[in-house]
Amino acid sequence: MNMKKKEKHAIRKKSIGVASVLVGTLIGFGLLSSKEADASENSVTQSDSASNESKSNDSSSVSAAPKTDDTNVSDTKTSSNTNNGETSVAQNPAQQETTQSSSTNATTEETPVTGEATTTTTNQANTPATTQSSNTNAEELVNQTSNETTFNDTNTVSSVNSPQNSTNAENVSTTQDTSTEATPSNNESAPQSTDASNKDVVNQAVNTSAPRMRAFSLAAVAADAPAAGTDITNQLTNVTVGIDSGTTVYPHQAGYVKLNYGFSVPNSAVKGDTFKITVPKELNLNGVTSTAKVPPIMAGDQVLANGVIDSDGNVIYTFTDYVNTKDDVKATLTMPAYIDPENVKKTGNVTLATGIGSTTANKTVLVDYEKYGKFYNLSIKGTIDQIDKTNNTYRQTIYVNPSGDNVIAPVLTGNLKPNTDSNALIDQQNTSIKVYKVDNAADLSESYFVNPENFEDVTNSVNITFPNPNQYKVEFNTPDDQITTPYIVVVNGHIDPNSKGDLALRSTLYGYNSNIIWRSMSWDNEVAFNNGSGSGDGIDKPVVPEQPDEPGEIEPIPEDSDSDPGSDSGSDSNSDSGSDSGSDSTSDSGSDSASDSDSASDSDSASDSDSASDSDSASDSDSDNDSDSDSDSDSDSDSDSDSDSDSDSDSDSDSDSDSDSDSDSDSDSDSDSDSDSDSDSDSDSDSDSDSDSDSDSDSDSDSDSDSDSDSDSDSDSDSDSDSDSDSDSDSDSDSDSDSDSDSDSDSDSDSDSDSDSDSDSDSDSDSASDSDSDSDSDSDSDSDSDSDSDSDSDSDSDSDSDSDSDSESDSDSESDSDSDSDSDSDSDSDSDSDSDSASDSDSGSDSDSSSDSDSESDSNSDSESGSNNNVVPPNSPKNGTNASNKNEAKDSKEPLPDTGSEDEANTSLIWGLLASIGSLLLFRRKKENKDKK
């Protein structure tokens, strides 16, 4: 339904002459005097636009002129209801330029403008500004339609009009992905722009995002909103869709998936036509950046299509004029997509589905958020969940004590990551910290999506300081100086815009355990960037030259006329969205164990994204080896042992032993051991043993033993032995020991052994040992051995060890050994050790990713859409205008008349008197004429 102002006055030609004309005019003005002033200010009537109803050519068009004093247009939900005055809609029959702006509220009034099409304009006052980006240009094309108007992804269009202080006649409105399409019909000049059926369509296209619903602004990415055109999604051919990722995606290790598309464009496509790509709600296209952008599809150095993200998170591409001059256009597109932390909060399987039209791709992946880091009673994990490079800000979320352990005197510190050129600014002016208490650890989401309203804000109860440059410190001041529940720390900080480094942070938790042992645990956070790309090409199509006019032919519309939907799009865009797709993800890894052993681990991770992990280990080992051996052995040990032992022992031992033995043994063994041990031992032994052994062995043994032992032992021994042993054994053992040791041993052993062995052994041992051992020994031996041995051992050892150690050790060892050993051994061992240790390691992870998806786009678009709108209907003359239209166009530029307010009673009285006088004159003249006859 359209608003039209119809004012027609008919004059009857009678023989009564000038007097009757005068009387009729006076009577008409007398009756309409009180209503005319009102009509000049706000007179609209409603009329339905039926397809067969003829419209008058003198109908006026209502357009919009913006106020100049910081007028703003709202982007909030509004409905196209012309009865309640909520929405102001202004549309020209050719083009309407729409821009987004921010700041103040809007007050709208009406200004009549000459044209052929009529639209509805209502008043709108004090509309709040919710637009997040300024310099956002879009185009809307409205054609005349036959009893229907098609809307594709139409957003609210609001216009501001003012008859005063108006210096610009262009239409200012807000739109996102506006595409209004229609076809002309005979004798139809008014577009049905305010049909009530469009209300839901308008509302659905408006972004009303709550905090962290999606970590980007849809308004900000609609910088190149598509002009109106046809949705040709279902006309694309040779469509291919793919989801490229591993079976597992690690979002907190910069993990992402690639969405790949390919298609052919029909030759009938023209500038302004669009197609849609559906993106699943489990994915977003921004990662941790505050805004998301999609790459343009390029054909060499020309832009084939520009894309924006609509309010549902889907992507809409609009073709440029490249397709107007090309045939057989083909295009490919790749976009990085990230697991959405709000819609996927827990680790588990997720099915992803994306597509173009009826062609879709599905893939089920395991989303693994990985667990927090834990060291004894300390646990911590953090993530960088938002970056805004426009405002140079970031947000980091840290889980403190997510395991819910008891931590005494807990302290959290935040620093720049060591050995990096981090661009973070940490000080009181640039850093804001909020602390929340979590009553139940199960309430923590694994994706680190946090709704602060669900937790208790205890920021005022903790002590937050900045003791050193680029460092903050949070002390949890609880009544008993300990915490037993998780806490969430949210850090809002700033980035140095002049720094060339990346964002890299380290968070460290300190505290005592129940044994009053001070420990620390750290977690590092960094950011990786990824980018997408789009490409295409086509074959030049022939251009048909302009043909001469033929008699009776309709005059073609000039190409520079605003009624050509594709000729004056006026977009001069300069965008960087191809190389900067605006997606950031975080990679978090870190382990910090405080152990007094000396461990060094260097980890190297290679991921498809760019992850860089650096773990820091602090190890301190103190060993004192003083070996003083004096072996003057002149022994003639006539011991002829010929041992041929073939033992096959398969033992599975789990031993937790703490032994301090001082033994002097002379053994001649020929062992063939095949052991596979997986040891993960946790022993805390404090032993003080004093053993004095004196062994004198003179043996002549010939033993042939064949032992097959399959032992599974679990021993916990603390021995203080004073042994005097004389053994000559020949064993062949095949042991498979599985020991789990984590030793924290402080042993002080004093052993004094005196051994005098006179042995002459000729052993030919061929041992093939396949051992998997993890030994943690702490020995303090002071041995004084006087051995005279003449051994000829021929051992052939081949060791193939594959160890994967993850040790967690806290050892304080002091070893003082005085030993003198002379051994000539050739061992063939094939060991496969798998030890699980948590050590304090300084690991440097160097990952190489080519990703840059944080894009900054500069768009400067100039669109000119506002001409005389002289669209020539098929039944009109060539020039399309008559004298009345020209006069109306001229008069429309003049301001409205000052109607004022007259006294209605006086006016009616005057006109009544004049009408009476006229009537008397009329009757008198009739009588005179009658008398003459």
From Swiss-Prot:
The modification Pentaglycyl murein peptidoglycan amidated threonine is found at T899. Induction: Expressed on cells from both exponential and stationary phases. Up-regulated by sigma-B factor during later growth stages. Sigma-B seems to have a transient enhancing effect on bacterial density in the early stages of infection that it loses during later stages of infection. Residues 900-933 form a propeptide. Residues 547-565, 599-861 have a biased composition (Acidic residues). Pfam families: Big_8 (PF17961), Gram_pos_anchor (PF00746), SdrG_C_C (PF10425), YSIRK_signal (PF04650). Belongs to the serine-aspartate repeat-containing protein (SDr) family. This is Clumping factor A. The lineage of its organism: Bacteria, Bacillati, Bacillota, Bacilli, Bacillales.
